[in-house]
Amino acid sequence: MASNIIPTNQIAKIQTNKKLIAFYDKLHIAPIEHYAQIHAKGETDQTNGKVSSLIGISIQDYSNGTGQNNIITQFNLAPEQVQFLLKRIEVGFQDFEWSSDKIFGTPDANGYSIAQKFVITRHSFKQDGTVLNNPWYISISNGHGIRVQNHTGGYYMKGYYMKGGSYQQEKSAFINLNDMDLYGLLKRTDAYIRNWEMVNAYQTILQGQQAYAQYLSTVRQQNQQRQAPGYPQENPAYTGDQYEQRPSDNYGQSQYQYSEPQYQYNNPNY
């Protein structure tokens, strides 16, 4: 490798004389315990940090100069979100709007965490009816907001969302693209995601399937042992009289205390 060539995780970019948008590889393989999902989705890694498989997007605005005047904004999309946007172009949507916001990190002394906003739209015409040469508008805004924990939904639905009206923008940048430019960005990124999955998922899937098969085999053996003759039962001295109903000294209170069975789920922090 030539000494003047610097490795990069950049997948694709579009650059004009004033702005730039680029997509970056931030993909991570799922742990063996969750091999079938392929992509990491917030599980804890070996350093006890949470890892998610993402595609990074950066928009730079150097219309006012480079250096300190260069505005750089960032946002992360899930791989399937990139493919979702690609499908919108392939289907041929003439008008389209989609947005997403994220909040993460430890709150500061004032209770604010890092927050990001992403907006993408397509409109064919200006308000005066003129056809737009670059109908796609992509905007990224970075700032801070107050996070609120979501206690509803299933395990993977739980997390944080941004409190309404708490967002404080620090910087933002946008870019306008035509259909071909955006299609090229998304298509090349989608191709990278698919090839990454084929290269990285192979060993994980094999090891995960083997681990899962071993787990099922262990469970079956344990069940067979419990059902075998002579295996000690939980209540060997059980008789039907044990559960004979008798008057209770505590009126209005059941004498039968029900205890929820205790299950341990192999759910990592998300």
Mark where each language-model region is.
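Mixed-charge, glycine-accented linear interaction segment located at domain edges/termini
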Residues: Q149-R226
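Glycine- and charge-rich intrinsically disordered segments
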Residues: M1-A30, N200-Y270
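Compact, glycine/acidic-enriched structural inserts
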Residues: Q68-Q94
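Pleckstrin homology
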Residues: G92-S100, N195
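Short, solvent-exposed interaction modules
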Residues: P107-Q169
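N-terminal "first-domain core" detector
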Residues: A2-T73
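A cross-kingdom feature marking solvent-exposed beta-strand/loop segments within repeated
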Residues: I59-A78, Y156-F174
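Short, low-complexity cationic-aromatic patches
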Residues: Q46-V51, F75-P79, G129-V131, E170-L182
